[in-house]
Regions:
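Conserved phosphate/ATP/ADP-binding segment of small-molecule kinases
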Residues: 170-247
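Structural motif
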Residues: 22-24, 150-151, 199
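Conserved phosphate-binding/catalytic region of the ribokinase-like
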Residues: 2-24, 213-322
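Glycosyltransferases and closely related glycan-assembly transferases
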Residues: 147, 163-176
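Catalytic beta/alpha-barrel core
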Residues: 152-158, 179-181
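Conserved N-terminal subdomain of the carbohydrate kinase-like
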Residues: 16, 20, 45-50, 69-150, ...
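Glycine-rich phosphate/adenosyl-contacting loop at the front of the ribokinase-like
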Residues: 1-77, 85, 92
Length: 322
């Protein structure tokens, strides 16, 4: 079993100092086994494993680690992990990588387990095991890092457990970035989270995605969200706010592992936003970085310089509206 191939403490963007304030990422800390294969086998079939890696999740944890690589100070507020083998494995993994997190161990819960199978098409097939008891440990997580925060990141799939952090951020006028994935038609989710959300990211590379990007962005803006980011995988992306729409064609890359690409998009957008970049520049950079991430296994992020270089080459169309 291999371990992730980068170290946050010696990242290539160490000289890129960020603005004052920490990006706080709030969510579940899970043990993830990353499996790279040439092709996902047919049902009741098999195939060769190219690489097997002890890794970590969920998206909030990944975004926090990627922000650190980009040179942006971050802090991950996690759920607890169990006093079990998987808990010890993921604790060792995030510690070795320098992920900015204080791991809590709770012997009454089982560590969240995930298996992500990634193939060169960019697709991921994943399995996970969560318990209500584990999720409930988010309700007692220490929110004091929000006192000096510049942004809050959350994942919709952590449910009502993220509301406490979102409400706290809103009271302190801290912008909130929510990963909504494919839940743009889920009225209950939007009604619950949209009032606290400033930036929302949606993924439309799932098989069930039948709506066009512009329709999705309209749904999100009409729900009260200020900025909608629609990530279309290897094809394109769309960013929309009250005054403009930015359509970006993604660069073509040789895909090794699509795991973490959405998180890289999120982290890169937040990185640019905190530096005062406009919507087009943030979206170009996020699209470039998410695509470039797919060239390597795991969560290695391309340097800011290289990401900006590729971002400047992307075909982009900007429309302004009232």
């Amino acid at each position: 079993m291999s371990t992730p191939m980068y170290n946050q403490t010696t990242n290539q963007n160490a000289g890129f100092t960020g603005p004052e304030g920490t990006v706080v990422c709030f969510g579940v800390l899970s043990y993830l086994q990353l499996m790279l294969v040439e092709q996902v086998p047919i049902h009741n079939g098999g195939n060769t494993i190219r690489q097997l890696t002890d890794s970590y999740g969920d998206d909030a944890a990944i975004v926090s680690g990627m922000l650190q690589q980009l040179g942006q100070k971050s802090k991950f507020i996690p759920s607890a992990v169990g006093d079990d083998d998987l808990g010890r494995k993921v604790t060792a993994t995030v510690s070795g990588l320098g992920i900015p997190v204080d791991v809590r161990i709770d012997s009454s819960v089982d560590t969240v387990a995930e298996l992500s199978i990634s193939d060169p098409s960019g697709a991921r097939t994943y399995f996970y095991q969560r318990t209500p008891e584990l999720m409930a440990t988010l309700d007692s997580a220490d929110l004091s890092p929000l006192d000096n925060a510049s942004f809050l990141y959350v994942d919709w799939y952590d449910g009502d457990h993220i509301l406490r952090a979102m409400e706290s951020a809103a009271q302190s006028k801290i912008p909130v970035f929510m990963n909504l994935e494919s839940q743009y038609l889920n009225k209950e989710v939007l009604a619950k989270f949209a009032p606290y959300t400033d930036v929302c990211q949606v993924s439309v590379d799932q098989p069930e995605s039948n709506y066009d990007m512009e329709s999705i962005s309209s749904i999100l803006l009409h729900s009260g969200i200020s900025t909608a980011l629609i990530a279309g995988g290897s094809d394109r992306s769309l960013a929309v706010n009250s005054s403009q729409k930015v359509r970006i064609t993604a660069p073509k890359v040789g895909v090794v592992d699509g795991n973490g690409a959405g998180s890289c998009f999120s982290a890169s957008y937040i990185y640019g936003s905190l530096r005062g970049w406009n919507l087009e520049r943030c979206s170009r950079f996020a699209t470039a970085q998410a695509s470039l991430k797919c060239r390597t296994p795991g969560y290695q992020v391309t340097s800011v310089v290289e990401g900006e270089r590729i971002a400047d080459t992307l075909q982009t169309k900007v429309d302004y509206h009232n």
